[in-house]
Structure formats: structure tokens, C-alpha cells
């Protein structure tokens, strides 16, 4: 009986601990040999409503979203130097977003200033939910290209 009540208590605790409306999602990060790559995805509606100043800045650097664009993909390229995090901006970044339902979209991401350093970003069409494959193509000045893949579940 005690085992059953403990199990029930744990399940209820987990159910109430879940947050359905997390505003800022934790970015996903991949560690490469030379640097780290982090992505974050936020819907355009959330940006307009909660962060109008940030939306205006993104609109200035990325242009106005097209008719079917629903989300903003942000990419940060960074590395740790001692205790400091240094954001790297001397790259060109392209993103390819694929889903089982929508056709693949590949776009060059625009550089824009962020609170801690330069980020890269662009507008994309994503559905309300689903699993997305996001491929990033990062090129440096010498022509070397890194491909980084993220599987992203939009809920």
C-alpha cells in the first residue's frame, strides 16, 4: 500500500511540475571541436506579444516575415575562453528545416546583435507541433564547412 501511494505521489508531483506555457525554451547546444553551436526557436506571435523591442530588432535585421513564416530560428556560435563566453560572428550560416509534413526550407541566416554578442537568425514556417530536423551549414572565410544537425520537437 505504501509503495502504491508513493508511486501515485510521484506521478502527481511530476504532472503538476510540468509547465505548459514556457515562454523561453532552453536552447539546444552541440559541441564541436572548434566551437559550440546553440539554437533557439520562438514563435513570431510570442515575440510580438512578449518582446516587441526584440521583434522590431529582428525585423530590422532579418526583414519582415513572409506570409507563412511562423517562427524565428536563432543560432549562436560561441566558445569558452577561461571564464568568459565569446560569441563568434566571422561565419556564414545557412539553415535547412525539414519536417515530415512541410517541405524543406533552406535559407541563409542573417547576423544580428544580441545582448551578449552576435547571433544569426531567420524566419521559418513550422507547424503547431511536430518533429523537425534542423541542419546548419556553417562556413568560415577559408571555405571550411561544418554541418550540424538538431532534432527539434515542437510541442
PLM regions: where:
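Sec-dependent signal peptide recognition
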Residues: 1-8
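Hydrophobic h-region of N-terminal signal peptides that target proteins for export
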Residues: 9-17
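Beta-strand-rich domain onsets/edges
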Residues: 18-72, 78
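Short flexible loop/turn segments that cap and initiate beta-strands
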Residues: 84-98, 102-106
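Short, solvent-exposed, Trp/other aromatic-anchored flexible loops in extracytoplasmic proteins
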Residues: 105-137
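Short acidic/polar inter-strand loop motif in beta-rich domains
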Residues: 140-147
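Short beta-strand edge segments in extracellular beta-sheet folds
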Residues: 151-155
Amino acid at each position: 500500500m505504501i509503495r502504491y501511494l508513493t508511486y501515485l505521489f510521484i506521478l502527481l508531483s511530476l504532472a503538476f511540475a510540468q509547465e505548459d506555457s514556457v515562454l523561453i525554451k532552453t536552447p539546444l547546444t552541440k559541441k564541436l571541436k572548434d566551437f559550440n553551436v546553440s539554437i533557439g526557436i520562438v514563435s513570431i506571435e510570442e515575440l510580438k506579444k512578449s518582446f516587441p523591442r526584440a521583434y522590431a530588432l529582428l525585423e530590422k535585421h532579418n526583414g519582415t516575415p513572409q506570409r507563412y513564416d511562423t517562427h524565428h530560428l536563432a543560432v549562436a556560435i560561441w566558445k569558452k575562453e577561461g571564464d568568459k563566453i565569446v560569441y563568434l560572428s566571422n561565419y556564414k550560416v545557412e539553415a535547412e528545416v525539414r519536417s515530415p509534413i512541410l517541405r524543406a526550407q533552406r535559407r541563409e541566416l542573417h547576423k544580428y546583435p544580441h545582448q551578449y554578442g552576435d547571433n544569426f537568425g531567420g524566419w521559418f514556417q513550422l507547424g503547431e507541433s511536430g518533429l523537425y530536423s534542423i541542419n546548419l551549414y556553417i562556413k568560415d572565410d577559408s571555405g571550411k564547412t561544418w554541418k550540424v544537425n538538431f532534432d527539434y520537437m515542437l510541442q
